[in-house]
Amino acid sequence: RECGDEIPVRLVKGAYWDNEIKWSQENGVTGYPVFTRKAHSDLSYIACARYLLSDDTDGAIYPQFATHNAQTIMSIEHMNETHKRRIEYQRLHGMGDNLYDTLMKQKPGMVVRIYAPVGPHRDLLPYLVRRLLENGANSSFVHKLLDADTPVDELVVHPLKTAMRHEVYANDKIPLPPAMYEERKN
């Protein structure tokens, strides 16, 4: 800030979630280092976005939001109405095209960076598969949007309301690592 430069900070959500879950299970750790419910990841992302848009970071951080989630983008846009910060969105080449095309028509000047991963095949393929799985999951906004049986009010449920539906914080459908292989110590 004192030098007049802003540090670009890229906020991502869930990029290595499956790797963290698998590592925890293979190593038999007591719990998971990541949220096991999507709503909690969504809330955490929004909380971090709120901080990145706050006066505390103005002039020091250039917020970059990597997301293909329409509700997340709308939350960020709403929070930024107050601060009017210069921000950037980022999307993976081939994902979120229609969403961002529509937004850029509605908001000329919106900065959207399209990125394409590069690297050796052994690293690149797993990365792309993770992104496809993440964005094609049944819980994704686009999947619900295309499903004629999904009520409109279910498309725009705030993640806090979704999180509050559960009595237990952790997702009980994902067994804790020590319970994975009870016959042996991981």
Segment roles from a protein language model:
Residues 1-185:
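Positively charged, amphipathic and often flexible ligand-engagement surfaces
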